[in-house]
Amino acid sequence: MAERESGLGGGAASPPAASPFLGLHIASPPNFRLTHDISLEEFEDEDLSEITDECGISLQCKDTLSLRPPRAGLLSAGSSGSAGSRLQAEMLQMDLIDAAGDTPGAEDDEEEEDDELAAQRPGVGPPKAESNQDPAPRSQGQGPGTGSGDTYRPKRPTTLNLFPQVPRSQDTLNNNSLGKKHSWQDRVSRSSSPLKTGEQTPPHEHICLSDELPPQGSPVPTQDRGTSTDSPCRRSAATQMAPPSGPPATAPGGRGHSHRDRIHYQADVRLEATEEIYLTPVQRPPDPAEPTSTFMPPTESRMSVSSDPDPAAYSVTAGRPHPSISEEDEGFDCLSSPERAEPPGGGWRGSLGEPPPPPRASLSSDTSALSYDSVKYTLVVDEHAQLELVSLRPCFGDYSDESDSATVYDNCASASSPYESAIGEEYEEAPQPRPPTCLSEDSTPDEPDVHFSKKFLNVFMSGRSRSSSAESFGLFSCVINGEEHEQTHRAIFRFVPRHEDELELEVDDPLLVELQAEDYWYEAYNMRTGARGVFPAYYAIEVTKEPEHMAALAKNSDWIDQFRVKFLGSVQVPYHKGNDVLCAAMQKIATTRRLTVHFNPPSSCVLEISVRGVKIGVKADDALEAKGNKCSHFFQLKNISFCGYHPKNNKYFGFITKHPADHRFACHVFVSEDSTKALAESVGRAFQQFYKQFVEYTCPTEDIYLE
C-alpha cells in the first residue's frame, strides 16, 4: 500500500494556470495564485474516494496511463517519455506477485517455472509448450488430471492466503466460502467463443483494467485483458482445464502472445474468493449514431464512484463520457448509470436484481445463476484508513442537512475548470459536460444552501453553513446582549426537535448552557443557529477550558495584534507540523473555495493575536451585525502547533491546531490582500511571551522561605 501511494504521488501536478479565487476582488498582481503544488494524498481528508484511490489504483482505465505490471511489450519506445511510463516505473514494486510476467524476454522464465512446479507435483507432467509456440495446444494438457477440473491444482499465492486450500474450504481471511470449482469451468468449456477459434476481437472491444497497448507494428488491436493477478503457473493451469471446442487455429507469428492472452481471459472470467478483485469500468449504452459500437473507446472507459453508493439514485446522462474515480483526474461523475455497470468479465447485473442482458460472444450464455454470493469482493484498505457509512439517498433530491452526496471531490472535479491543472494535468482529456447536480463556478447565490460533506466542510462562522469537525478544535464565543459569552458545551449527537420548545442540534454545534434541570434536560443557546431551547443532557459534553491560572496570566497582558483577512476554510490534516502539510491544506482548500466563491464568498474576519491564543472574529456587515449576535472562534495558544505563510505566495496564511481532547489536527487557512509575514511574526511573538509567562509560573526564581 505504501508503494502505491508513492507511485501515485509521482504524478504531481504542475502549477495552476489561473487563480482559484476568481470572485475575490483583491488588489494583487496577476500571479496571485498558489504555485506550490503538493500531491493531494500527503494529507488525509478521510473521504471514501481516497480509500478507493489507495486500494484500486489500477481502476484508472486510460491508454496513456497503465499502473499494472508491464505485459506484452507495454513499455514501448514511443511511450518512454510519457507520464504513464514514469508512473509505471515507480509502480513496479507493488504488492502484486509476478509483476514481470508476460514481458518480452520473460516467456522462457515463465515456462521454466511451469516445468519446475509441474515436476514437484506427483502425477502432473510438464506442459508441452515452447516460448515461440502458439499457446492454444497448451489447453490440451497431456499430464493426468489436467484435462478435467476433478483434480485440484494448488496455485501460487496472490493474496495474504499463503497456504493452498482444497476446494470448498473456508477462507479464514475474508470469512468467505470458496465457490464451486466446476460450474464455471463447465460453462466456459460449453461456450462457443470466437476467441478460442482464432478470430480477432471486435474493433471496439472494451479495454479492461490494464489498458495495455500492443507492441508497435503489431496488427492486432488492443485486447480485452482479465482482471486477475494470476501467476504464470495459474494461467497455464487455467488454460489447461478448458478443453477446446474445436481444432485450434494456429495464429501468425506476430499474434502468438495476443492469442494466448485471449485464451487466458476466456478461462479466468470467474475469479476465486481469495483473490483481489478490481472493479471494471462503468459502461454506457452505445450512442444512437454509433450502432456498431459495443463498448466505449479506451479514453472514455473511465469509472465513476461517488461517495453516496445508492445504485437507484443514478440516472442516465446521454452523450457524456465517464470521468475517472480519483481526485487527481479532472472529471467526477455522480450520475453513474446502473445499466452501464458490469462486473469483471460479463454483462450480468446480478447485484441489481435485473435480468441479464444478451451475453457477449466470448462469455457463456449461462450467466443468469450468477450473483454476488458466488464472487466475494475484497476491499483492501490501509490500516489507518477510516470508512464512514452514509445513508442512501437520491442524487437528484434536495440536499438535506446531513447530505454527504455533495462532497468536495464532486465539486473539485470539473473538466472545464482552468484550475484543474492543480489537481492533475497529466490526466487531462477533452472538456466534458458537467452533470447538473455538481456544483461549478456557474452557481448563483439563489441556489439552495448546499452542504458539503462534514469530512471536508469549510467553516464560515456566519451561520450560513453547517458545523464541521474542525470547529471542535477551538471555542466559540458570542456577544449576547452586549456581553461576550464563551461556549460551554459541544453537541456530540444530532437532535431533531419534536416539540416547539426543543432545540435542534447538529454534531459539534457550540452551545451555551444556561440552565441544567434535574430531569437531565439542558436549556441552552445554540451559537451557530442563534436559537434557544431544551435538549437532553447526554446529547452534549462540556468543553475543555484553560486553567484558571493561565487565564489570569493572559488577562494581565494587554498586548493584542489585529489583522484583517478573509477566512477560506479548515481541513483536517494527519500531522501537527510541516510546510508540506500546510501547503497541501492550502492547495485543497483553495481548489474547493474556487468553486463556491460565487454564491458563498469567503468571510471577512479579524484575527486577534494575544498571549491567550488566536481569535477569529467575523466581520459582517453593519446591517447583519445589528440584527444578530456577533460570534467569534477562539483557539488556545497551547493547542496551536504550527503556523506560517505559503513559501511561494505570502498572501496565504495558515496555522495547525490540535484537538483539545482527541489526537486530531486541523489546518485553518486565510488569505490577505497584503503579505502575511507580519501575522506570522505576531504569532511567534505570542508564543515567546506565553512560554515566558508559563516558565515564570511553573518554575519561580524567587527565594522561598519556610517558617
From Swiss-Prot:
Region (Interaction with VRK2): 467-656
Lineage, broadest ranks: Eukaryota, Metazoa, Chordata, Craniata, Vertebrata
Amino acid composition bias (Low complexity), ranges on this chain: 13-24, 71-87
Residue ranges, annotated region (Disordered): 1-26, 69-367, 425-447
Domain of life according to the entry: Eukaryota
Induction of expression: Upon neuron differentiation.
GO cellular component: axon; axonal growth cone; cytoplasm; cytosol; dendrite; dendritic growth cone; dentate gyrus mossy fiber; endoplasmic reticulum membrane
Family: Belongs to the JIP scaffold family.
Protein name per its UniProtKB record: C-Jun-amino-terminal kinase-interacting protein 1
Gene this chain is encoded by: Mapk8ip1
Tissues and organs where the protein is expressed, per its UniProt entry: Expressed predominantly in the brain and insulin-secreting cells. In the brain, high expression found in the cerebral cortex and hippocampus. Localizes in the synaptic regions of the olfactory bulb, retina, cerebral and cerebellar cortex and hippocampus. Also expressed in a restricted number of axons, including mossy fibers from the hippocampal dentate gyrus, soma, dendrites and axons of cerebellar Purkinje cells. Also expressed in kidney, testis and prostate. Low levels in heart, ovary and small intestine. Isoform JIP-1b is more predominant in the brain than isoform JIP-1a.
Motif placement: D-box 2: 360-368
Provenance organism: Mus musculus (Mouse)
Positions of the UniProt region annotated as Interaction with MAP3K7: 279-467
Modified residues (Phosphoserine): 14, 28, 39, 148, 177, 183, 189, 191-192, 210, 307, 324, 326, 336, 351, 362, 365, 403, 405, 440, 443, 465, 467-469
GO molecular function, a single term: kinesin binding
Subcellular compartments: Cytoplasm; Cytoplasm, Perinuclear region; Nucleus; Endoplasmic reticulum membrane
Location of region: Minimal inhibitory domain (MID): 153-172
Domain text: The SH3 domain mediates homodimerization.
Entry's transmembrane regions: none
